[in-house]
Amino acid sequence: VSRHPYVLSLLSQAYQGLKDWDKLLDLLPQLQKHKLLTVEEFEQLQRQVHRNRIVQGNTEPQHLLAIWHKVPKYLQRDAAMIEAYVHNLIKLGDHDAAEDALLRALKQQWSATLVRQYGYVHSVNATRQLARAESWLIAHPEDPQLLLCLGRLSLHEKLWGKARDYFESCYRLQRSPEICAELGRLLTALGEP
């Protein structure tokens, strides 16, 4: 690759247009070395490259893990990056890795977005998973995403009454289409109007 700044800039634009995130990843050090972007622009591009590589890395869990290991440590703590990674792990059926990643992240910093993802994880020990999520209610009693998560985990365990209570509590706090759909499906399944 040419080291000429103008060529590097053109390559960066071309790779972005082509959505060739792997080639753009290889180009990042040169873009940084030649200071072709501000610090903010570089970090934004770096975030975009790694997020898109994660989103597209949905072939098998090992491949996704290799992609994740190339993500800089500071971005591995970013909620949006973790969410993309966990979403793909769940899609690939690696619920154990998804749960581990979420628990590590939530231990560092609370994130309603990540708690929402926790409701999609099918843990090997679903009872323990539900109990863990319920323990979070002490610190976050009115977090709609936590209540939605708890409703979903309760549904998975076929705890209909508990699921209904969580969904209704969530509905009182936030009347999103998502919670309306969850509550509606549950009430229909229970044969209630």
Predicted regions and their residues:
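Repeat-based scaffolding regions
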Residues: 1-193
